[in-house]
Amino acid sequence: MAMIPYDDRDGFIWLDGKMLPWRDAKVHFLTHALHYGSGVFEGLRCYDGHIFKLKEHSLRLIEGCRMMDMKISYTADDISAACLEAVKVNKIGDGYIRPLAWRGAEQMGVSAQLSKTHLGVAAWEWPSYFGAEARENGIRLKTSRWKRPSPENAPVHAKACGLYMICTLSKHEAESAGYTDSLMLDYRGRVAELTGANFFMVQKGELHTPEADCFLNGITRRTIIDIAVKRGIKVHERAIMPEELKTAEECFATGTAAEVTPIGTIDNMNYKVGPVTRLIRDDYEKMVRMPSSQAA
């Protein structure tokens, strides 16, 4: 089936307070974010038309703008309302929502002191990120040569557009070698994350996940930790070295887009989709379809 370009679709996109026809939601060529990566975004999922963890994502977008020294005139409630409106007007059941704040075209050059921060929200049907086969058999990862940077080198806890450059390079490298995605190490050589998801492994029935000190502490990551604790599964947030992957019984990835996706291969190491992964995944899938008051 041919891919439908994202700039040529039916529907509507919320842009700076107005709901525009999808194809008319455009920015100028000299937009600062296009040249310098000065943007912050979020990714949310809705299930049966209900957005999961909406407040948390809206607050994180505001905090990301603060980290990027971007003065945004919208509140978290404004962002949440725009997301809800985008889902409603596009009649989305199970789908994905992408809010994006970016610096505009008022000023060109590295400095952006005079540039206005814009906000847009798109929503579209998107049932699965990795696909049904990956869900059953696990995705295949290749360790990337690109490293996650130190907190001294970049605002690593912001979901900033510019930080995804190395993720794109890593994913292309993996796909060209026949893998699904990359496993990225950090600047110290420790296991960090995938290009757009957090990493968990199971050892002796307990969960281990890298300490989120140089990458995004994902909202789904924190949700999975809560699920595990409620199930009585011990969780270790710690430094994980690549050689430890040989002793992992199960591995899985978590993220808003990825949800809970098992990992079947890392380089030349293979893993089964085991009972802990299935339990966590099943609990998460039940939670995302609960009313907001019960899923909190």
Give names to the regions the model predicted.
Residues W102-Q107:
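Short, internal active-site loops enriched in acidic
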